[in-house]
Amino acid sequence: MYTFRYKSHHDASGELKKKYTSAESVLSYVERMLNESAASRRVIYLHVPFCNKICSFCPFHRPDELRRRDYHRYLIEEMHRICEYPYMRAPIDAVNFGGGTPTALLPEQMDAVLTELRTCFDIAPEAEISVESSATELTAEMLEVLKKGGVNRLSIGIQTFDDEGRTLLGRRGSGEHAAHSVRRAIESGIANTSIDLIYHYPGQTMQRLEADLAVIRSLGIAGLSFYPLILHEKTPIYHKLGEKERALL
């Protein structure tokens, strides 16, 4: 659908800074933009800053878990707050749920957000609606909610199918369960399913990497994002590794 996909908020922020003058704040630029009727294609991004299990390599801030139970209401309030701006009245070509892990919300919370999304905005018939998830959150109930809400793309954070690697990286469930979750998502009708894979983590061998790639080939996924492990200070995996191990990464 698009020629380029920004992989992180860092990339998106860099592009945003090119859009407004140095004398103008980001807030005033966004306010001005929302009050204009432009012909460019529209994308909505919804952020869910929660995870049911924190990856051992994750350096990001964790918000108060007590906020999670009401977070869908916050998203719905925000949608209603901006949907009447002239800029948002045009058809929406794509919707991206990122995080965090958006499917860390309860199925009924996700259902409420997806339902209200179509109430607030004119979602184009061919719009890509993409949700990030981990393997363990893709239960039959969650998949049913996503399909009902029009989700047609999934990005699943697998990282590795190797059981020892999954334990080291703080992923829940076995590699076999992760592969089953990917298959189930595709079989549910979300053919545009992609996964994230991490390489160059401690203990990974060429044989383990080749085994991961063999599983991937068998799944029939639509895309693969392949990243090296980036070691951040103050993360569990950083403290677990010795100085010599850290120096090799």
What is the role of each PLM region?
Residues 3-8, 56-60, 116, 186:
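A broad, low-specificity signal for short, low-complexity segments enriched in glycine/proline
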Residues 40-73:
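Canonical Radical SAM [4Fe-4S] cluster-binding loop centered on the CxxxCxxC motif
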Residues 62-87, 92-249:
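Conserved non-cysteine loop/helix-boundary elements of the Radical SAM core domain that shape
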Residues 31, 35-38, 55, 97, ...:
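General secondary-structure edge motif
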Residues 1-44, 53, 88:
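Flexible, acidic/Gly-rich N-terminal and inter-domain linker regions that tether
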